[in-house]
């Protein structure tokens, strides 16, 4: 049974995931109005969509630095401030350039939260429920995506400035996130790593009073072993977790997930749906994502990370292959015009159950304490570099190569992911962070 305090701290920290998801998806309802308002070319339009992702890449690359130096909790507070400033600034932006600046700041918050939030939750969670608790971050991401899609749908017809309202409502959860963060403690592993033994033990006592001494000894022993080795992430003993994190994050994005999240209304319009139906279908994607992430998070500690990835990979291969065939044959009117939306709903279900539920859990588990923030930053930045590439190039390739070839590429990448999971992915369920370190790190 998870301590109520640990659950509360995890839920609060996972609010960073809600803002992450909302910020990611909200632009899908505003992008066409923004393009028309400022008369953007296709290149400028692509840059407008991807500027937040560029900020996200930088936030992910460097988010481990304040997390290590200032602490996990203080870094999360600054992330909340970035979300708030971005939401208000983008909603009130008088021109394209300041709009881009504020979207960039929001991207920094997304990137840094993808490093610090899973990291913090993994460091306060007991081994037997770590998957579920860290999975709250991904659950809140998709909850944020769903909320953004529904918000966009409800605000779409309120007037010519509806896109400003779509972007501005994000300020409300950002304020809540900032205020609640003053009720969470610092990570006990970060405190012990920085020699603050009494404070670290106090937090461990709040987590599980019966195991304070054993947990402290295990963490300090692991840190002592790490202290005999290089703290550089690129040292040879960290080769296995580094390769696992990079590969996992790479495959997460070449599944095409963010192309579908960002451009869902346009993809549906390509199949002949009207704008209103396309926006509503996008909200359906958010709902499916929400439900199957909830399922994945609830079973990840029972069936394990690897099993979820195997099931998901097979489902993604099947659905992407069928979507590609639909575009090749142009038979969009089958099943009342709902063939492609139905297949993409199934695609989202398989993704949410597997990659969506697993990625932040797995990457937060596989690095030792001394380099965990750096490793999380590496996995997150790889994820966001690929997300930026996909978001920036998807409109171009969909137009030049067609939907069939584009979705066939994503399908091929998922075949490679299946091989990766079968050959190289270890199982980490039910193992302490220090136990995972013994398995993956060469001492």
Where are these regions (language model features)?
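Alpha-helical transmembrane bundle of multi-pass membrane proteins
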Residues: 1-198, 224-443
